[in-house]
Amino acid sequence: DNIKPMKEFESPEKLYDELIASVRKYHPSTDISLIEKAYHVARDAHEGQARKSGEPYIIHPLCVAIILAELELDKETIVAGLLHDVVEDTVMTDEQIAQEFGDEVALLVDGVTKLGQLSYDADKVEVQAENLRKMFLAMAKDIRVILIKLADRLHLSLIHISEPTRRR
Protein backbone atom coordinates (compact mmCIF):
# COMPACT_ATOMS: atom_id res chain seq x y z
CA ASP A 1 0.00 0.00 0.00
CA ASN A 2 2.86 2.39 0.78
CA ILE A 3 4.63 1.85 -2.54
CA LYS A 4 3.80 4.68 -4.89
CA PRO A 5 3.89 4.51 -8.69
CA MET A 6 6.92 6.00 -10.40
CA LYS A 7 6.76 9.75 -10.74
CA GLU A 8 7.92 11.41 -13.92
CA PHE A 9 11.48 12.72 -13.30
CA GLU A 10 11.24 13.91 -9.71
CA SER A 11 14.15 16.15 -8.78
CA PRO A 12 16.76 14.60 -6.47
CA GLU A 13 16.20 17.43 -3.98
CA LYS A 14 12.45 16.75 -3.84
CA LEU A 15 13.06 13.02 -3.38
CA TYR A 16 15.61 13.74 -0.64
CA ASP A 17 13.05 15.91 1.16
CA GLU A 18 10.52 13.07 0.81
CA LEU A 19 13.06 10.63 2.29
CA ILE A 20 13.75 12.85 5.30
CA ALA A 21 10.02 13.46 5.86
CA SER A 22 9.42 9.70 5.79
CA VAL A 23 12.21 9.04 8.31
CA ARG A 24 11.01 11.83 10.62
CA LYS A 25 7.44 10.51 10.48
CA TYR A 26 8.33 7.25 12.25
CA HIS A 27 11.49 8.37 14.11
CA PRO A 28 10.92 12.07 14.92
CA SER A 29 14.05 12.34 17.08
CA THR A 30 16.42 10.56 14.69
CA ASP A 31 19.65 12.37 13.91
CA ILE A 32 19.55 12.53 10.12
CA SER A 33 23.13 13.75 9.69
CA LEU A 34 24.37 10.29 8.59
CA ILE A 35 21.55 10.05 6.02
CA GLU A 36 22.35 13.55 4.80
CA LYS A 37 26.05 12.69 4.52
CA ALA A 38 25.23 9.47 2.62
CA TYR A 39 23.00 11.39 0.20
CA HIS A 40 25.78 13.89 -0.54
CA VAL A 41 28.38 11.14 -0.97
CA ALA A 42 26.09 9.11 -3.28
CA ARG A 43 25.08 12.22 -5.25
CA ASP A 44 28.71 13.25 -5.75
CA ALA A 45 29.84 9.68 -6.52
CA HIS A 46 27.13 9.26 -9.18
CA GLU A 47 27.64 12.78 -10.60
CA GLY A 48 27.35 12.71 -14.39
CA GLN A 49 25.78 9.22 -14.44
CA ALA A 50 22.32 8.83 -15.95
CA ARG A 51 19.83 6.00 -16.31
CA LYS A 52 18.68 4.87 -19.76
CA SER A 53 15.62 7.08 -19.26
CA GLY A 54 17.93 10.10 -19.05
CA GLU A 55 17.19 10.87 -15.41
CA PRO A 56 20.13 11.37 -13.03
CA TYR A 57 21.35 8.08 -11.55
CA ILE A 58 21.00 9.40 -7.97
CA ILE A 59 17.21 9.10 -8.39
CA HIS A 60 17.50 5.30 -8.09
CA PRO A 61 19.38 5.14 -4.74
CA LEU A 62 17.05 7.83 -3.39
CA CYS A 63 13.98 5.80 -4.36
CA VAL A 64 15.51 2.67 -2.80
CA ALA A 65 16.13 4.62 0.43
CA ILE A 66 12.54 5.95 0.36
CA ILE A 67 11.19 2.40 0.04
CA LEU A 68 13.33 1.35 3.03
CA ALA A 69 12.18 4.40 5.03
CA GLU A 70 8.54 3.61 4.26
CA LEU A 71 9.21 0.14 5.70
CA GLU A 72 10.37 2.01 8.84
CA LEU A 73 13.84 0.49 8.77
CA ASP A 74 16.74 1.82 10.81
CA LYS A 75 18.99 4.68 9.78
CA GLU A 76 21.93 2.39 8.88
CA THR A 77 19.77 0.42 6.44
CA ILE A 78 18.56 3.64 4.80
CA VAL A 79 22.15 4.89 4.54
CA ALA A 80 23.19 1.57 2.96
CA GLY A 81 20.26 1.92 0.55
CA LEU A 82 21.58 5.30 -0.55
CA LEU A 83 25.09 3.88 -0.96
CA HIS A 84 24.20 0.44 -2.36
CA ASP A 85 25.62 1.11 -5.86
CA VAL A 86 28.52 3.38 -4.88
CA VAL A 87 31.20 0.68 -4.51
CA GLU A 88 30.04 -1.20 -7.61
CA ASP A 89 29.56 1.80 -9.93
CA THR A 90 32.12 4.39 -8.74
CA VAL A 91 35.69 4.64 -7.46
CA MET A 92 34.65 4.52 -3.79
CA THR A 93 35.87 1.46 -1.88
CA ASP A 94 34.44 -0.71 0.92
CA GLU A 95 37.14 0.69 3.19
CA GLN A 96 36.05 4.27 2.48
CA ILE A 97 32.42 3.34 3.22
CA ALA A 98 33.51 1.80 6.55
CA GLN A 99 35.64 4.82 7.41
CA GLU A 100 32.92 7.35 6.56
CA PHE A 101 29.79 5.48 7.73
CA GLY A 102 30.93 2.69 10.06
CA ASP A 103 31.38 -1.06 9.78
CA GLU A 104 27.65 -1.83 10.01
CA VAL A 105 26.81 0.24 6.91
CA ALA A 106 29.88 -1.11 5.10
CA LEU A 107 28.79 -4.71 5.76
CA LEU A 108 25.29 -3.97 4.46
CA VAL A 109 26.63 -2.33 1.29
CA ASP A 110 29.08 -5.19 0.76
CA GLY A 111 26.29 -7.74 1.20
CA VAL A 112 24.10 -5.98 -1.37
CA THR A 113 27.05 -5.75 -3.78
CA LYS A 114 27.66 -9.50 -3.44
CA LEU A 115 23.96 -10.25 -3.95
CA GLY A 116 24.14 -8.07 -7.06
CA GLN A 117 26.52 -10.59 -8.53
CA LEU A 118 23.73 -13.17 -8.68
CA SER A 119 22.99 -14.52 -12.13
CA TYR A 120 19.42 -14.29 -13.42
CA ASP A 121 19.47 -17.08 -16.00
CA ALA A 122 16.14 -18.69 -15.14
CA ASP A 123 16.79 -21.78 -17.28
CA LYS A 124 19.59 -23.18 -15.17
CA VAL A 125 18.63 -25.01 -11.99
CA GLU A 126 22.22 -24.91 -10.68
CA VAL A 127 22.33 -21.13 -11.07
CA GLN A 128 19.03 -20.75 -9.22
CA ALA A 129 20.31 -23.00 -6.43
CA GLU A 130 23.50 -20.92 -6.15
CA ASN A 131 21.43 -17.72 -6.05
CA LEU A 132 19.32 -19.13 -3.22
CA ARG A 133 22.45 -20.23 -1.37
CA LYS A 134 23.89 -16.70 -1.59
CA MET A 135 20.60 -15.18 -0.45
CA PHE A 136 20.33 -17.51 2.54
CA LEU A 137 23.93 -16.76 3.53
CA ALA A 138 23.20 -13.04 3.31
CA MET A 139 20.02 -13.48 5.36
CA ALA A 140 21.90 -15.42 8.01
CA LYS A 141 24.37 -12.55 8.33
CA ASP A 142 21.84 -9.69 8.22
CA ILE A 143 18.28 -9.76 6.86
CA ARG A 144 18.60 -6.04 6.05
CA VAL A 145 20.86 -6.95 3.11
CA ILE A 146 17.93 -8.82 1.55
CA LEU A 147 15.54 -5.95 2.31
CA ILE A 148 17.86 -3.46 0.56
CA LYS A 149 18.22 -5.78 -2.44
CA LEU A 150 14.44 -6.28 -2.62
CA ALA A 151 13.90 -2.49 -2.49
CA ASP A 152 16.51 -2.16 -5.27
CA ARG A 153 14.72 -4.76 -7.44
CA LEU A 154 11.31 -3.24 -6.68
CA HIS A 155 12.41 0.20 -7.84
CA LEU A 156 14.04 -1.25 -10.97
CA SER A 157 10.78 -3.12 -11.69
CA LEU A 158 8.75 0.07 -11.24
CA ILE A 159 11.09 1.87 -13.65
CA HIS A 160 10.72 -0.95 -16.18
CA ILE A 161 6.91 -0.94 -15.90
CA SER A 162 6.66 2.84 -16.24
CA GLU A 163 9.09 3.21 -19.18
CA PRO A 164 6.56 2.38 -21.95
CA THR A 165 4.31 5.12 -20.55
CA ARG A 166 7.17 7.63 -20.60
CA ARG A 167 8.04 6.84 -24.22
CA ARG A 168 4.63 7.93 -25.50
Where are these predicted regions, by residue range?
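Active-site helical microenvironments for divalent-metal-assisted chemistry
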Residues: 1-162, 166-168
